């Protein structure tokens, strides 16, 4: 099974991707995480990618496509995966279809711009286990202590400020809305209301994928 999660930054793709992937025992491939890992390396490619991220711009298709192809053709993904954040435009979608022939399901997370900004500005994660929190909606049960692993060290993303977020959302709309129209005609396109809470969204996705 190959599942693509589409939606703007802050729509909840990462949170749901991890949950659903664990439930159906498939890898969750988060494109943003892949590129953030690359950025931490001391390479010219990392510096180039980081410049796009800091400015809230999308990384060029030729860079994204090659990185993703190298990942997806690995043997560990031969049985399927949940793909979070790719493709983002028609050119990427057609490139993806050129080397992936399996049937896919596309799930789009529909969320208002105002809620997206709050979700992104408020989010942070445990540095130890990666558990995601939000200062507006989902704080740890005990202040400054991770619910999962008990760590008190958290990571706040440096590219998450309101001006950059608004630009990322606008860039997303320009690049990705034509892709949504393209997939609507595929017969395997589904929309979930991303404004619901985590549990409700998870249930909706499980129904689409026909899992318990």
UniProtKB/Swiss-Prot annotation:
Major subcellular location class: cytoplasm
EC number annotated for this UniProt entry: 2.7.4.3
Keywords of this entry: ATP-binding, Cytoplasm, Kinase, Metal-binding, Nucleotide biosynthesis, Nucleotide-binding, Transferase, Zinc
Residues engaged in binding ATP: 10-15, 123, 132-133, 196
Reactions performed catalytically: AMP + ATP = 2 ADP
Annotated pathway: Purine metabolism; AMP biosynthesis via salvage pathway; AMP from ADP: step 1/1
GO molecular function terms attached to this record: adenylate kinase activity; ATP binding; zinc ion binding
Binding site for AMP: 36, 57-59, 85-88, 92, 157, 168
GO cellular component entries: cytoplasm
Span list, region LID: 122-160
Cellular compartment(s): Cytoplasm
Top EC class, one word: transferase
Binding site for Zn(2+): 126, 129, 146, 149
UniProt-annotated stretches for the region NMP: 30-59
Disulfide linkage: none
InterPro entries recorded: Adenyl_kin_sub, Adenylat/UMP-CMP_kin, Adenylat_kinase_CS, Adenylate_kinase_lid-dom, P-loop_NTPase
GO BP: AMP salvage
Similarity section: Belongs to the adenylate kinase family.
Subunit structure: Monomer.
Function: Catalyzes the reversible transfer of the terminal phosphate group between ATP and AMP. Plays an important role in cellular energy homeostasis and in adenine nucleotide metabolism.
Record comment regarding domains: Consists of three domains, a large central CORE domain and two small peripheral domains, NMPbind and LID, which undergo movements during catalysis. The LID domain closes over the site of phosphoryl transfer upon ATP binding. Assembling and dissambling the active center during each catalytic cycle provides an effective means to prevent ATP hydrolysis. Some bacteria have evolved a zinc-coordinating structure that stabilizes the LID domain.
Protein's UniProt name: Adenylate kinase
Organism in which the protein naturally occurs: Rickettsia peacockii (strain Rustic)
């Amino acid at each position: 099974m190959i599942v693509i999660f589409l939606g703007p930054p802050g729509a909840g793709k990462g949170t749901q991707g991890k949950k659903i992937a664990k439930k159906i025992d498939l890898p969750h491939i988060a494109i943003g995480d892949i590129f953030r890992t690359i950025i931490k390396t001391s390479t010219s490619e990392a510096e180039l990618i980081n410049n796009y991220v800091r400015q809230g711009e999308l990384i060029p298709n030729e860079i994204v496509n090659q990185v993703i192809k190298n990942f997806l053709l690995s043997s560990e993904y031969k049985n399927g995966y949940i793909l979070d954040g790719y493709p983002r435009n028609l050119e990427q979608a057609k490139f993806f279809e050129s080397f992936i022939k399996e049937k896919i399901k596309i799930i789009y997370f529909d969320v208002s711009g105002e809620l997206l900004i709050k979700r992104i500005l408020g989010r942070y994660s445990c540095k130890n286990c990666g558990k995601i929190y939000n200062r507006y909606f989902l704080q740890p049960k005990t202040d400054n202590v991770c619910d999962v692993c008990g760590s008190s060290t958290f990571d706040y993303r440096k590219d998450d400020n309101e001006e950059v977020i608004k630009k990322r959302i606008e860039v997303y709309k320009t690049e990705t809305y034509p892709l949504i129209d393209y997939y609507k005609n595929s017969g395997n396109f589904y929309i979930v209301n991303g404004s619901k809470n985590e549990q409700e969204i998870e249930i909706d996705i499980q129904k689409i994928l026909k899992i318990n």
